[in-house]
From Swiss-Prot:
GO biological process: anaerobic cobalamin biosynthetic process; methylation
Pathway assigned in UniProt: Cofactor biosynthesis; adenosylcobalamin biosynthesis; cob(II)yrinate a,c-diamide from sirohydrochlorin (anaerobic route): step 6/10
Protein name: Cobalt-precorrin-5B C(1)-methyltransferase
Protein family membership: Belongs to the CbiD family.
Organism annotation: Rubrobacter xylanophilus (strain DSM 9941 / JCM 11954 / NBRC 16129 / PRD-1)
Length: 388
């Protein structure tokens, strides 16, 4: 095998928070907006007056920091009040940007708070999400934020309230997320750990990858399949049709986090299905594969070319390739089928090492156009439905 490279996860550079020199705006999570709406409705219920502004405290690392929100709509009725706060996700491409987080607060005879879901908020149907099956998909931190915000608005120890959080259009939004696969049906999740949406949701995506692994483990699964996007996931599902949908995880750039979590949760076998670019970076030991944080090591691809029996001239062309795809096209044109196999073997070895040797890992490379396997680590294809 070519010379070993150190396994690493490059840090996120400052450029990830800037676009063309402009600092990107952070935004607010659905949890923060739900807490703000709940507090506005509670204050309206207690005072009998509609609210125009509301202030809430952020959790976690932002604890102590208070932020103000305008109230989009506030209505009162007999024994109830309802308020709406519109989510601003900042410069993050978030499907819930512009969502109307709505809270209806009504009196109840018993002290304390009853928190429930309304239209557009999902319900948990599978274990492994940190919430009971059958519970509203309102995560623990947002739940605490809502309760704390209510305590600031009224004394629920003397007279209790029922709070219903809803998001009009939330069910449609949820179809664009991983919620259906994770077992959250009927709408979006109310999320957030810091109360803040950071640009590009890198932290949120990493957290969702970890959560997806947890769901596989909670359902007694042993096998997980990582892909980098919709196309490679489609290829993976064709290769492994016997696995349940929950086993397939779009890992994006967070392969390292996924395999470490899988090892920690006691899973046994993992597959990585990808194209040349991501595989080339993983073969170099780079576990965080975003293009701004790492470049393809064409010298490694040249070494693999030689190892696979390619000519020195071909190796030099591969080393000068402008992308991993270009290198693969050079291999394909030369009929060097052994090179993708060696690349996948290197990836599987690196992933096993990154998991501390606790996982049986396999890697499969698919063609950019046909999505059919063009290389795999030893024994990988024998475990699939591929009979090409």
């Amino acid at each position: 095998m070519p010379e070993r490279r150190e396994l690493r996860e490059p840090p996120m550079p400052p450029s990830m928070a800037r676009v063309r020199g402009r600092k990107l705006r952070t935004g607010w999570t659905t949890g923060t907006c739900a807490a703000a709406a709940a507090k506005a409705a509670a204050r309206a219920l207690a005072s009998g007056e509609a609210q125009e502004m509301v202030e809430v405290r952020l959790p976690g690392r932002g604890e102590g920091r208070r932020v103000r929100f305008g109230v989009e709509r506030c209505e009162l009725g007999e024994g109830w009040a309802e308020a709406v706060v519109v989510k601003d996700a900042g410069d993050d491409p978030d499907v819930t940007h512009g969502a109307h987080l709505t809270a209806r607060v009504s009196w109840r005879e018993e002290p304390g708070v009853e928190l429930d879901r309304g239209e557009g908020v999902g319900v948990v149907t599978k274990p492994g999400l940190g919430l009971p099956v059958g519970a509203p998909a309102i995560n623990p931190v947002p739940r605490r934020m809502i309760l704390y915000s209510l305590e600031e608005a009224l004394d629920t120890r003397r007279r209790g309230v029922r709070v219903v959080i809803s998001v009009p259009g939330g069910e449609e939004m949820a179809r664009k997320t991983t919620n259906p696969r994770l077992g959250i049906v009927g709408g979006i999740s109310i999320l957030g750990t810091t109360g803040i949406v950071r640009p590009f949701s890198t932290a949120a995506w990493a957290a969702s990858v970890v959560q997806a692994i947890d769901v596989v483990a909670a359902q007694g699964g042993d096998t997980f399949v990582l892909s980098t996007g919709g196309l490679t996931e489609r290829a993976a599902m064709r290769l492994l049709p016997h696995l349940e949908e929950v086993c397939f995880i779009e890992v994006g750039d967070f392969t390292g986090q996924a395999v470490r979590r899988a090892a920690k949760r006691g899973l046994g076998r993992g597959f990585f299905v990808g194209m040349a670019g991501k595989l080339a970076k993983l073969a170099s030991g780079v576990m965080m594969t975003h293009w701004t944080r790492s470049r393809v090591d064409t010298s490694l691809l040249a070494e693999i070319t030689r190892k696979a029996g390619g000519s020195e001239r071909l190796a030099e062309e591969v080393e000068g390739a402008n992308s991993a795809r270009h290198a693969y096209e050079l291999w394909r044109a030369a009929g060097l089928s052994g090179a993708p196999r060696l690349l996948c073997a290197r990836v599987a070895e690196n992933l096993r090492e990154h998991a501390g040797g606790a996982l049986e890992m396999h890697a499969i490379m698919v063609d950019f156009d046909t999505l059919e396997p063009v290389g795999a680590s030893p024994g990988a294809l024998e475990l699939t439905a591929w009979r090409g």
